[in-house]
A protein has these predicted regions:
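Conserved phosphate-binding/catalytic loops in two-lobed NTP-binding clefts
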Residues: 102-109, 256-275, 728-735
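A charged, amphipathic alpha-helical module
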Residues: 315-400, 519, 523, 527-656
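Redox- and metal-dependent alpha/beta enzyme cores, enriched for Fe-S-associated oxidoreductases
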Residues: 394, 406-407, 412-439, 622-688, ...
């Protein structure tokens, strides 16, 4: 803590990919001292030592700590003189707490916004370009929120590219503007850093130095804008340009040329992240002890029912121990009652345990409750889903096996009495085993399928144990690549491929003509399966499948409505894996039973959660598209670390019209069109409608394959962002891959932190959380 006789000082530290920055801020908001220093990994050093010393500097993290200690010492200060320290930056690691005492961590985006607003309080647009990524930040007055966009994994629009150019031309970045020929028309590649560097090598001995520098700086500016400039579309005003790349005034010149906006470079542009962290440290110090983390969804049970406690007593076999357990149960039952509505909370269970005299009985109770608390909040339906998935995907039977994609109506296959295998879901199940996944990717690569191919489809091409299909059905939309891969798989596994494969033509736009086209196609697909498999469709069974689908639909809508109108009841981390709209159980009794159990569990959860949480007390996020299946880290970080629960998931929207058992093909065609994924306009409208109904405060789109997936491409994202902005809902786009973790950009957690901090600022008036009442 700072000395009481002195004015308070606040420290902000920004640990980036190539530099470390620090700022000391006074109580009055004046910069007392700043530091901008290149970081160089220590030769042969470990990431972090295991000793007690925290500032010896003999490991990489320790070296960073020693840099801060030396920085403070240069102005005659130590950490004891600092009232509050906040850190930010892409290279902040978990071990940092052992080496540097700090009070809070904030995202780089929030830090840069705070830094810019410290000197430009009315600024509306900020562009930060550092060594590893570019960040655009824009204030939306209608939503009263700072929106942001970060570049992906390419280095072309970052300081790393300019460092490469500087080294090749032997010109310091700070001198490039002086040597730049701004009238030059020479162009180099702005597609990627590697191609750009290749162009520099090709041109440096063939053109004047000023022309080459101009080409490199223009390419840099263009790549920055192609990566994050979408956020500034239709914006006309000043842009605060900060970060290390702002040392190069030539890049600023070309940014102004491209955007038509005035570019302002602050005095402290290289340390604006650290400055913002120091500004936030001053605010955090003033709120210390007054704020608490926002409420989020519980991931585990908070208590056990009295009947469950009775089960514990009944399980005790030793007569003496049983008498003691029964005595304790009677005392509890007198206070709580014996019905299933009363519960023992975890603290109450601890008190009960203290009343037990037998150590053995204490251990037995502890083991019993641990098992209960480790269960998910919707335990029975989760177990049913697991069992049904295992049966559907891994059981063997005499019935013909039909491969299907996510969109072909499962009711038809249920009525035909065949076994079905949804190939995309089968691939997703592989995601939990990275070793097995790697083997699939390796084998697919040997067949010529590179990373440009969807990872779901690469898994299928590379899986040498893919169950043999007797027939395959797919749809032409929304994934044409999937249709072609399915056809290739059939050719590779079936001698008479043409008679064992059917593509249902699915027009992107709805209307009666599209419905008729799909209905006729469904009839053709049934005829093709009848011929190939030697089976016959029973119209009564198809009508029954429609009736069962309607029953499950009605229950699913009730489940949705409960979640729409309640505080977050279950973690989105778990619920997104349900993917109800893609299930192959529609048309079966199992789906009805599953939805009935899930409904009962949700009603019980609702009663419990609403005792201590109001619907408006938490953030309410909508998760769009699929999650990363290889790890729950991303969604867990969002919901638990950042306290921003997912209230609902797009893949669980059930809202199509009832099926008509007397006209099954037409109604199934209508269902297929109204699910939404075939037509972006229908999809976006449904998202908007459900978002309003569910009181959604923010949306997260997981951008599978970085926009190359047809269900989350750049045009869809642009349309979605504009549409959600109209109704005041901010959108976070997380680039990544649902199965291939090697392409996961290191900026994912930063984006999540920045998004939730902006939501906190809008909801609570500060980024840290609600003020205690």
């Amino acid at each position: 803590m700072a000395k009481k006789t002195e004015k308070k000082l606040f420290l902000g530290v920004d640990i980036g990919s190539t530099t470390i920055k620090a700022v000391i801020l006074t109580e009055e908001g004046k910069v007392m001292h700043s530091m901008y220093q290149r970081t160089v990994p220590k030769k042969d050093a470990k990431l972090a030592c295991t000793g007690r010393c925290s500032n010896c500097g003999q490991c990489n993290v320790g070296a960073l700590s020693k840099t801060i200690v030396d920085f403070l010492a240069s102005v005659g200060k130590t950490q004891n003189d600092i009232s509050c320290t906040i850190v930010t930056g892409s290279q902040v690691v978990d071990e940092l707490h052992r080496f540097l005492n700090f009070d809070y961590f904030v995202s780089e985006v929030t830090a840069h916004v705070s830094g810019a607003r410290h000197y430009y309080p009315d600024c509306k647009a900020i562009l930060d370009v550092g060594g590893q990524d570019s960040k655009a930040m824009l204030y939306n007055p209608e939503m009263n929120i700072w929106t942001s966009k970060m570049s992906g994994i390419c280095a072309a629009g970052t300081g790393a590219f300019l460092d490469s150019v500087s080294a090749k031309l032997n010109v310091p970045i700070t001198e490039m503007a002086q040597k730049c020929n701004f009238d030059s028309d020479l162009e180099v590649s702005s597609v990627c850093a590697v191609l750009g560097a290749t162009s520099i090598n090709k041109f440096k001995n063939r053109y004047p130095l000023g022309d080459v520098i101009a080409a490199a700086c223009r390419a840099q500016a263009r790549t920055i804008m192609s990566g994050v400039g979408e956020l500034f579309l239709n914006y006309h005003g000043d842009i605060i340009f900060q970060g290390g790349v702002a040392y190069n005034r030539a890049v600023a010149y070309y940014l102004k040329e491209i955007t038509g906006c005035n570019i302002i470079i602050p005095e402290f542009h290289p340390v604006m992240g650290a400055l913002g962290a120091a500004v936030l440290a001053r605010q955090y110090d003033s709120l210390r002890g007054k704020v608490e983390p926002p409420k989020t969804v519980e991931t585990k049970r908070t208590g056990i029912t009295i009947p469950e406690f009775k089960n514990f007593v009944d399980a005790v076999t030793d007569p003496n121990l049983r008498r003691e357990a029964m005595r304790v149960f009677d005392n509890v039952a007198k206070v709580k009652g014996e019905d299933g509505n009363s519960k023992l909370t975890f603290p109450e269970i601890s008190k009960v345990k203290e009343t037990l005299q037998s150590e053995e009985l204490k251990k037995t109770l502890e083991s019993f409750t641990d098992k209960l608390f480790d269960r998910t909040l919707v335990n029975k339906s989760t177990a049913m889903r697991t069992q049904m998935t295992r049966h559907e995907f891994f059981s063997k039977g005499k019935e013909p096996l039909v491969w299907r994609n996510l969109f072909f109506p499962s009711e038809i296959l249920a009525a035909l009495g065949v076994r079905s295998l949804t190939l995309e879901t089968y691939a997703a199940l592989k995601g939990s085993n990275q070793k097995r996944l790697r083997r699939c990717f390796d084998h697919a690569a040997c067949k010529g399928f590179s990373g440009e191919t969807c990872s779901f489809l690469r898994v299928l091409e590379g899986d040498q144990n893919l169950p043999h299909a007797d027939f395959t059905v797919t749809t032409s939309q929304p994934c044409q690549q999937g249709e072609r891969i399915f056809a290739d798989l059939v050719r590779s596994n079936c001698s008479s491929s043409s008679s064992r494969f059917y593509t249902l033509h699915t027009p992107g736009r709805g209307g009666e003509s599209a419905i008729r086209t799909i209905a006729e196609g469904l009839k053709e697909s049934v005829a093709a399966m009848e011929d190939a498999l030697g089976i016959k469709m029973d119209p009564d069974r198809l009508a029954e499948a429609c009736v069962l689908s309607n029953k499950a639909r009605e229950l699913a809508i009730k489940c949705n409505q409960i979640r729409f109108t309640s505080p977050p009841l279950i973690p989105g981390t778990e619920a997104v894996s349900y993917a109800n709209i893609f299930s192959q159980l529609w048309g079966k009794q199992e789906m009805v039973d599953l939805q009935q159990v899930f409904l009962e569990e949700l009603l019980e959860r609702k009663k419990e959660v609403e005792k201590h949480t109001h619907i408006d007390e938490t953030h309410r996020l909508l998760w769009l598209h699929l999650p990363p299946f290889y790890s729950q880290r991303t969604m867990t970080y969002l919901e638990q670390t950042c306290h921003a629960p997912v209230a609902f998931e797009e893949v669980n929207f059930v809202g199509w019209e009832e099926l008509d058992p007397n006209d099954p093909y037409t109604s199934l065609a209508r269902k297929l069109l109204t699910v939404g994924f075939l037509d972006p306009e229908v999809r976006v409208n449904r998202i908007k409608q459900r978002a309003n109904t569910a009181k959604i405060t923010g949306a997260v789109l997981y951008n599978h394959m970085f926009g190359r997936c047809s269900m989350a491409d750049s045009s869809f994202i642009k349309y979605l962002r504009q549409s959600l902005t109209e109704i005041g809902i901010p959108l976070l786009v997380l680039d990544g891959d649902c199965l291939d973790e090697t392409t996961d950009p290191c900026s994912t957690l930063t984006k999540i932190s920045a998004f939730t901090e902006a939501l906190n600022l809008n909801k609570f008036g500060n980024i840290f959380g609600p003020i205690r009442k």
